[in-house]
Amino acid sequence: MRGIRWTTTAFLLLTAAPGLAQSANQSAASAADDAFGTSVGNERVGLYNPDSARGFSPVTAGNLRLDGLYIDRPPDFSQRLISGSNIRVGLTAQGFPFAAPTGIADFALRRAGSDPALNATLEVGPYTARRFALDGQTPLTSSISLGAGLDYGREDQPNGTKDYYYTFTIAPVWRPRDGIEVMPFYSRYYWKGWSGQPLYFVAGDFLPPRIRRHENPRQSWAGEVGVAPTFGIHSRASLGPWLLQAGLFKSGFEIEGSAVELFQNVDRDGMGDRQIIELGHRRTWSVSGEMRVSRQFDEGKRRHTLMLNLRGRDRQRRYGGGVTLAFGRVPVDQKGPIPEPDFDLGPPSHDHIRQANVGAGYDLKWLGVGQLSLGIQKVSYRKQAERPGVQLPTSRSNPWLVNAAINVEASKSLVFYGSYSTGLEESPVAPAVASNSGFAPPAILTKQYDAGLRYVISPNVRLVAGVYQIEKPYYGLNASQLFTNLGTIRNRGIELSLTGTIAPGLNIVVGTVLMDATLSGEAVEQGLVGKRPVGSSRRTSFANIEYQLPGAAGVTAVVGYGGRGRTIANRMNSSTIDPANSFSLGARYRFDLGGKPTSIFARVANLTDEYSYQMSGEGLYYSPGRRFIMTLTSDL
């Protein structure tokens, strides 16, 4: 591994030259067309992200795209491979063939251009964290360019845990002629010492007492070691009226040493039963991909597109065998070192999923009138599960999935839209505290309705307003800590987004979601769970305001806000977390250093040091406190 790392670094240093695509002059706020979730590099703005959209997770649901093509992604993408992402919901999802409920997380690959270039990033914070990254590209021939990146850093988690990581990516691009591109890539992400925050489970209808933040690090022996490679090939060919797109990917991770620390039966005085769960060796590998053939037919102002699509995945997973050890009743705010115990791990469990989707679609774009999209898919889903000493029956599902979307241009500035879609999605995996920890339920059938409008207030300002309803089977913890089906969840919401330049030098990304999440079914009727899911909130809001200061060339003030309403804190809905509001304040300075574009972005997150709790299953953990981050980015 050491040889690859230094070879990549040498390549980057030798190709220093102007003009890298991910430059010092870009920001997520300036790139955002709406407030539903946009990232550029390590900056992110918007209401949603790949792990949370409309009350669900696109990652968990399997609704990920790599430049428009399906990928089944168990690990995180390296930022050296990905230049950014967008969350596609409502009107923006209509441009994606075979759109799925929950929303789509579409990741953009870093593509090497035809000019030599090098970009460097140095980041300090939060706390004692440090990060250094390089991204470079150079032409090898008239039709082949090579891109590569390296990232090394030390993270400092909100609980005080320190961990280290590095990533690297190699990604050549072949463009034999206009309209044809083939991009193989290899990316590897390695980390050591990471551990999640401690979880607190209270003994009644109250929250834990205030716990000192950043002073609860993991045990010295408890940090996990993991590696997550992602590699494959992405290609497209535009041949007159024909468009061919294909991608084949392999991704996965292997993790050792995961230890989850939690405190059960926490009382009002801050005493709790201390436990550590060693999860054992975990491994997930998936081969996935998509192939699509499209044919366009132009008819005056109308463009018809017919599509045939094949999508599939083969995922194998090893998990389970973990063990829980108890360390007595202790003050939850006075963690002391524990000698490393001898964990007697049990035998693991295995899952194997095979899925194939065959689909056909039709898209009509009518200039000045609107757009119509229709799609149908036949799915073949098989899941084999093996528990210690038990071979479970194979789970099978062969549904037909449909999607239909329409938008109508009422005027040049006003568009109305509506859609309906069904999907076969993965449900969340059982958390570490479940009696069946790591268990992944069979895929679930989901459906979604949405409608709304987009109004272009001015050439630079856009308003989007919409409503949606999503229904899915709901899995959660029952009274005996078994992760099981507890009924049906229905999320209904109103989304609002306002983005653009509202005055000279003043750019905004503002959005809010008002959501009504409800549960129904036998468990609710019998009083085993409440009518609202754990962790749900009726309001989520976001704002990012950037103002270029007059008289201060290159200086932009940045103000951020993130907030949520009251949050359901337990299964019976008898406890809640108060509304939380977090503000950030920063400044970005753009200038030339030796004739090269450079920027410094300094900001303070959680400016008022707001203290709140968040949910992980039915466990609670505290939000990060006030912290400072400074990022220096320069084209070299």
Model-derived features: positions:
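Surface-exposed extracellular loop regions of Gram-negative outer-membrane beta-barrel proteins
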Residues: K192-W194, P198-A203, D314-V323, R382, ...
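Gram-negative outer-membrane beta-barrel transporters
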Residues: L367-Q371, Q469-E471, N485-N570
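A beta-strand signature from Gram-negative outer-membrane beta-barrel systems
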Residues: D34, G55, A61, R65-D67, ...
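Repeated loop/turn-to-beta-strand initiation elements of outer-membrane beta-barrel proteins
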Residues: S143-L146, D178-V182, P241-L244, E299-R303, ...
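Face-selective signature of the C-terminal outer-membrane beta-barrel domain
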Residues: G226-E254, D273-R387, E409
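Transmembrane beta-barrel wall of Gram-negative outer-membrane proteins
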Residues: A117, E123-R154, N159-Q197, W221-W242, ...
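Acidic/polar loop-and-plug regions of large Gram-negative outer-membrane beta-barrel proteins
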Residues: V173-R175, G179-R236, G252, E256-T284, ...
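Conserved C-terminal beta-signal and adjacent last beta-strands/turns
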Residues: A21, V534-L636
